[in-house]
Structure formats: structure tokens, C-alpha cells
Amino acid sequence: KRGGSVADIAILVINVLRGFEAQTFECVEILKARKTPFLVAANMIDRVPGWNSYPDTPFSKSYPLQDPYVREDLDNRIYDVIGAFSRLGFKIDRFDKVREFASTVAVVPMSAKTGEGIHELLMVLIGLTQQHLKKRLQTTEGPAKGTVLEVKEDPGLGLTLNTIIYDGTLQKNELIVVGGKEKPIV
């Protein structure tokens, strides 16, 4: 919820073998409520039974090299995902069939493990970002304001904060103040 509440754009990663799960619905509701543009990464295509992986290859190149029954299996899994989104009121299709990206959510089949489809995922993300955020992306002067997503201890670095700065700038060695449970932390 924390990341979804401040995100300008999102990639919703779905395990193509499992389809929609409980957390998928939760994420979709957050994105819908915030009107956050997003695309869907249908991950783990390399785990579809019979899939022959071609590492770091665009999906559009590895897909035609698969046996027909494997392509049909993957298509059915993707259309199950598309159907679930359609029932929630979204216009959605596989990225290579989308005609109007402004009004249609794109599904990009990919594998984080083998790198297949990452090329198309980045292309769609860049296009979506340019389309939806062109007027919103700007640098503002002044003190940084942001949202802390996570606080953790990193070996060699010490205490680290993962944040999203949404206003102003933050410079190296600059003093920051974070709201703590009982009092501000400097």
C-alpha cells in the first residue's frame, strides 16, 4: 500500500502460472483508486510446461519458436489474466495487440529469470511513462519531501531508508528528519 500510494506509474507483476491471487486484487484496487497508470508483467513464462527458453530474447522472437501446444497454453493463461481484469472493468490485451495504449492496459509476457520479454516490458514502460507523465515530470528546488517505504540495516552501509522523493531535492551529506513513533529522528 505504501508504494502504491505515491507511485506515478506501476508494473503489476503476475505469476502467469497462478494468475490472479489475493494480493493481485489488492494491488489493482490501490492502482484503480489512485488512478495510477500501470502495465502487467506476466512473469515466469519460462515455467510454462514445454517452454524452450532463449535468454535475453524479446518475447516477440522467442514466442514463435515455441511448439504450438506451448503457445496455446501460454495464450490461455494470459487470456485468463485478461478476463480477470476485464471483469474488474479494465480494457486490457497482450501488448502486441494493443492499438491505443492510452486507454488499454498492456500485458507483457516475460521471464525475470531468463530475461525473455524484458525488452518489450521496458519499451511499453517507456512509452507509458512518456504518455502519462510528460507534463508531470519536473525538478523542483527546495528541501526534499518524501515517503519512507522501508527502513533496514544494510551490512557495510548501516541504517538505510528506501524513500520516494516527490518534491524538492536531496543532496549528499544533507541532514534529514524522519517522523518516528515517539518523536522526530534526525
Short names for language-model regions:
Residues 93-186:
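Conserved catalytic-core segments of large NTP-driven translation/proteostasis enzymes
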Residues 21-22, 47-56, 116-120, 185-186:
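Switch/connector loops and helix/strand junctions flanking conserved nucleotide-binding motifs
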Residues 5-25, 33-51, 73-75:
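Conserved Switch II/interswitch segment of TRAFAC-class P-loop GTPases
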Residues 14-17, 67-75, 110-115, 163:
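Hydrophobic alpha-helical scaffolding
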Residues 2-6, 29-35, 100-102, 141:
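Conserved catalytic network of the ASCE P-loop NTPase/AAA+ motor domain
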Residues 23-30, 77-84, 120-128:
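Alpha-helical scaffold elements adjacent to nucleotide-binding pockets in ATP/GTP-utilizing enzyme cores
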Residues 45-100:
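GTPase G-domain guanine-specificity segment
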Residues 2-4, 25-28, 53-57, 123:
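Short, glycine/charged-enriched secondary-structure capping and boundary segments
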